[in-house]
């Protein structure tokens, strides 16, 4: 919700960096925040490419490195192709992805009856080990919600962003939350936890448990993770463009190809770092790093909104209560602190 209001107040590329500059007038903070957003996008894309390799294993066991290279090369080509073409591709794959999640819920629909009869099963035991496990799981699961905030980073390529951006963010959050809740119920009641633990293609395992070929959902999941990686590559390159346009990054990142109207240099740099991360780190480590950096960014973004509400008297088209960004900042700090302590144990 904080992103929705900030997108209405300050519709610019490199949104988070622009928010920090407008709120606190601190170029160093803006620069750090902008580069942190680029890092989140790049690490997140690397996580998704690893996920692609996992779902591809349902069809064939192929060497990971060549698959990753071809995958990143293809995504980079689409991102360079043009913003209109890239987003049209992303929208089409998003529709396919949503259809896949609905398919999982339908084929494992008996899980909802089990949930109605035994809803207490979804609750953890109230002991220290279980609670710590749930919080740690929530930290990693937070990664699933990363992406909605990327909408603000293409603000300058959106018509009437003051109204369109908040609406898009709210709709994205509501739809994704609803689907994730349904999938969580299905995953809890459809198959034993040990079946899903460590499974590289968990949704395929759920579908297979109901007598359907796992290849159906694995095929859809392949496109889903590619779509997520594509969006992150586009976002990271646009943030680099915004930073360079504001003098906060090398000018080369602000160069736009006259034919494709895309920042080719920035896109290539993001893709190169993405390949390096895929080679160096496993999926779970990438997801943890992404969540940690994203929570730090969200903390600052919530503080930016609180500061702007204090400084600016004009209400934007979309406005949230002050308590919302305050609660968001406190919750993000609490999750960072807990996971940091847990990591050091």
Functional labels for PLM-detected ranges:
Residues 9-15, 22-29, 156-166, 171, ...:
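Juxtamembrane helix-boundary/capping and inter-helix hinge elements in multi-pass membrane proteins
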Residues 35, 39, 69-77, 95, ...:
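Generic alpha-helical transmembrane segments of integral inner-membrane proteins
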Residues 63-66, 91-215, 341-344:
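Helix-loop-helix junctions that connect adjacent transmembrane segments
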């Amino acid at each position: 919700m904080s992103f929705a209001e900030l997108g209405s107040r300050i519709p610019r590329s490199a949104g988070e960096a622009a928010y920090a500059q407008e709120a606190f007038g601190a170029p160093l903070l803006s620069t750090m925040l902008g580069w942190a957003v680029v890092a989140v996008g790049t690490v997140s894309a690397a996580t998704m490419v690893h996920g692609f390799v996992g779902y591809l294993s349902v069809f064939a066991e192929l060497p990971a490195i060549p698959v990753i290279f071809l995958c990143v090369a293809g995504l980079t080509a689409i991102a360079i192709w043009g913003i209109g073409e890239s987003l049209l591709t992303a929208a089409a794959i998003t529709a396919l992805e949503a259809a896949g999640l609905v398919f999982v819920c339908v084929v494992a629909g008996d899980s909802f009856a089990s949930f109605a009869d035994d809803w207490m099963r979804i609750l953890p035991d109230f002991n220290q080990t279980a609670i710590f496990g749930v919080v740690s799981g929530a930290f990693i699961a937070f990664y699933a919600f990363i992406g909605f905030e990327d909408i603000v980073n293409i603000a300058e390529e959106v018509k009437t962003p003051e109204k369109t951006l908040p609406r898009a963010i709210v709709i994205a959050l509501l739809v994704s939350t609803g689907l994730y809740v349904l999938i969580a119920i299905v995953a809890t009641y459809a198959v034993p936890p040990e079946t899903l633990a460590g499974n590289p293609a968990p949704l395929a395992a759920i579908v297979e448990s109901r007598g359907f070929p796992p290849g159906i959902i694995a095929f859809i999941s392949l496109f889903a993770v590619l779509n997520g990686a594509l969006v992150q590559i586009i976002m990271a390159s646009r943030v680099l463009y915004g930073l360079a346009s504001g003098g906060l990054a090398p000018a080369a990142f602000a160069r736009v190809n006259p034919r494709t109207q895309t920042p080719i240099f920035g896109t290539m740099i993001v893709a190169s770092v993405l390949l390096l991360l895929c080679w160096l780190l496993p999926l779970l480590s990438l997801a943890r790093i992404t969540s940690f950096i994203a929570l730090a960014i969200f903390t600052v973004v919530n503080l930016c909104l609180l500061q702007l509400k204090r400084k600016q008297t004009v209400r934007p088209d979309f406005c949230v209560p002050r308590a919302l960004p305050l609660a968001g900042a406190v919750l993000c700090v609490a999750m960072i602190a807990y996971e940091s302590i847990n990591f050091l144990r």
